[in-house]
């Protein structure tokens, strides 16, 4: 049950088919998005009251936005507000629906005769549609969007902004696709919208992502579809048909909270040869924390106490938690190779290189006997990232943070390039 939140609601700013947006008098720059108990299809050509849909939609959106925010995606979401609404930063909405597809189905097949249903896109295919109910939301090209010269909250939508939204759409889809896989659900396609935050002037994921926003097939089987397509496919809307649709929506709402957790545990154990390397190790631990990975620090020397080194190693091997060992040893690195030669777990050597003997010392981490498979990464942050990439193969939450980090790095470079180009004009 959501905690009751008292808000001072002002005027209605917008009303759509399935939601209303209100200003919040006590928090300038924030709005309330109120969902409706209404379901529509075909630009509201079909429209029905569906008791409980507002709460279902709000729960799904709140969980999905929380998942994306925690991954590092910039999202117009502050917190859930009761069962049927949430508070968000106020945005000026960009009137484009961004669609990302992994599997060809639905309208794509109608617009592209000859493509077989089930064709898979690698990478996912991104399309855009101008929000215009009177013209059935026509598909737009990138060139049309740029030529429109839209300006929202003072931000002109040009090539840079279009590229950012396109890349973000793909990243968001891939994160949600990966998140649904542990539930044995295939995310087939998805539509999202972006807005410009009126306070920060940044492009952010906005509006909602609920069961109207995607196609979701349990076990990859279209006949088991749980999304709004089950409503679109009704030849005639009957009370029984609506009840079936509601059960599908409830099925998704019951499982969406599971996306915020991972059944796959993970842990990084950093073994340092001396406490003089503690600062180097703390950087690794901090970087692991950015990926949500628990990290423990231990002190042991493979040269001076190999028996204790192997005992510590066995301690972590014995509790069943997937672990990556990171060895931090200066001068002659015996720690990483000894660990790697005596465990089936991944080992990363991250030696603290010094200016005087670093060029010579690093060879003890690089030139190793046969049968030793530890990698060497000099950057503390890089070693944590490599550990995250290992865990991300089976942990969707870690993978989501990695994917969002890639996107955010790309966006920062794109924005820096735009700023430099503007200075050169």
UniProtKB/Swiss-Prot annotation:
Pathway assigned to this chain's UniProt record: Purine metabolism; IMP biosynthesis via de novo pathway; 5-amino-1-(5-phospho-D-ribosyl)imidazole-4-carboxamide from 5-amino-1-(5-phospho-D-ribosyl)imidazole-4-carboxylate: step 1/2; Purine metabolism; IMP biosynthesis via de novo pathway; 5-amino-1-(5-phospho-D-ribosyl)imidazole-4-carboxylate from 5-amino-1-(5-phospho-D-ribosyl)imidazole (carboxylase route): step 1/1
InterPro entries: PurE_classII, PurE_dom, SAICAR_synt/ADE2_N, SAICAR_synthetase, SAICAR_synthetase_CS
Keywords: Acetylation, ATP-binding, Decarboxylase, Ligase, Lyase, Multifunctional enzyme, Nucleotide-binding, Phosphoprotein, Purine biosynthesis
Keyword hit for rRNA processing: no
Protein EC: 4.1.1.21, 6.3.2.6
Cited SUPFAM superfamilies: N5-CAIR mutase (phosphoribosylaminoimidazole carboxylase, PurE), SAICAR synthase-like
GO molecular function terms noted in the UniProt entry: ATP binding; identical protein binding; phosphoribosylaminoimidazole carboxylase activity; phosphoribosylaminoimidazolesuccinocarboxamide synthase activity
Modified-residue entries (Phosphotyrosine), positions: 22
N6-acetyllysine carried by residues: 36, 247
Region of interest called AIR carboxylase domain, as start-end residue ranges on this chain: 267-425
Quaternary structure and interacting proteins, as annotated: Homooctamer.
PANTHER family: BIFUNCTIONAL PHOSPHORIBOSYLAMINOIMIDAZOLE CARBOXYLASE_PHOSPHORIBOSYLAMINOIMIDAZOLE SUCCINOCARBOXAMIDE SYNTHETASE (PTHR43599:SF11), MULTIFUNCTIONAL PROTEIN ADE2 (PTHR43599)
Protein name listed in UniProt: Bifunctional phosphoribosylaminoimidazole carboxylase/phosphoribosylaminoimidazole succinocarboxamide synthetase
Organism: Mus musculus (Mouse)
Highest classification ranks of the organism: Eukaryota, Metazoa, Chordata, Craniata, Vertebrata
């Amino acid at each position: 049950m959501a905690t009751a939140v008292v808000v001072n609601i002002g005027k209605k700013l917008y009303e759509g088919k399935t939601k209303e947006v209100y200003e919040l008098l006590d928090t300038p720059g924030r709005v309330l998005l109120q969902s409706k108990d209404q379901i529509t299809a075909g630009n509201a050509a079909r429209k029905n009251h569906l008791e409980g849909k507002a709460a279902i939609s709000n729960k799904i959106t709140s969980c999905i936005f929380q998942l994306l925010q925690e991954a590092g995606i910039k999202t117009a979401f502050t917190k859930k507000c009761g069962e049927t609404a949430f508070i968000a930063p106020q945005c000026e909405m960009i009137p484009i629906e961004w669609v990302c597809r992994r599997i060809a189905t639905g309208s794509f097949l109608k617009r592209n005769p000859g493509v077989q249903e089930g064709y898979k896109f690698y990478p996912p295919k991104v399309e855009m549609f101008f929000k215009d109910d009177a013209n059935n939301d026509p598909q737009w090209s990138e060139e049309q969007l740029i030529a429109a010269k839209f300006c929202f909250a003072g931000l002109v939508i040009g090539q840079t902004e279009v590229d950012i939204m396109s890349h973000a759409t793909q990243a968001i889809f891939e994160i949600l696709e990966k998140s649904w896989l542990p539930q044995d659900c295939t995310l087939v396609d998805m539509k999202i919208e972006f807005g410009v935050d009126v306070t920060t002037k940044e492009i952010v994921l906005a509006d909602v992502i609920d069961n109207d926003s995607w196609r979701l097939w349990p076990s990859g089987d279209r006949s088991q579809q749980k999304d709004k397509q089950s409503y679109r496919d009704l030849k005639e809307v009957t009370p029984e048909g609506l009840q079936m649709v509601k059960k599908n929506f409830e099925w998704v709402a019951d499982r969406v909270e599971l996306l915020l957790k991972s059944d796959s545990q993970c842990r990084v154990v950093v073994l340092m040869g001396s406490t003089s390397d503690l600062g180097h190790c703390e950087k690794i631990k901090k970087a692991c924390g950015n990926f949500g990975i628990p990290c423990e620090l231990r002190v042991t020397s493979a040269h001076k106490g190999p028996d204790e080194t192997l005992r510590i190693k066995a301690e972590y091997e014995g509790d069943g938690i997937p672990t990556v060992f990171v060895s931090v040893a200066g001068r002659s690195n015996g720690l990483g190779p000894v660990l790697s030669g005596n465990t089936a777990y991944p080992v990363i050597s991250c030696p603290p290189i010094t200016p005087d003997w670093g060029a010579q010392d690093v060879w003890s981490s690089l030139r190793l006997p046969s049968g030793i498979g530890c990698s060497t990464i000099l950057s503390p942050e890089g070693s944590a990232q490599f550990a995250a990439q290992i865990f991300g193969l089976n942990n969707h939450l870690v993978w989501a943070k990695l994917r969002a980090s890639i996107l955010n790095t790309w966006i920062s470079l794109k924005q820096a390039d735009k700023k430099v180009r503007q200075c050169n004009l």
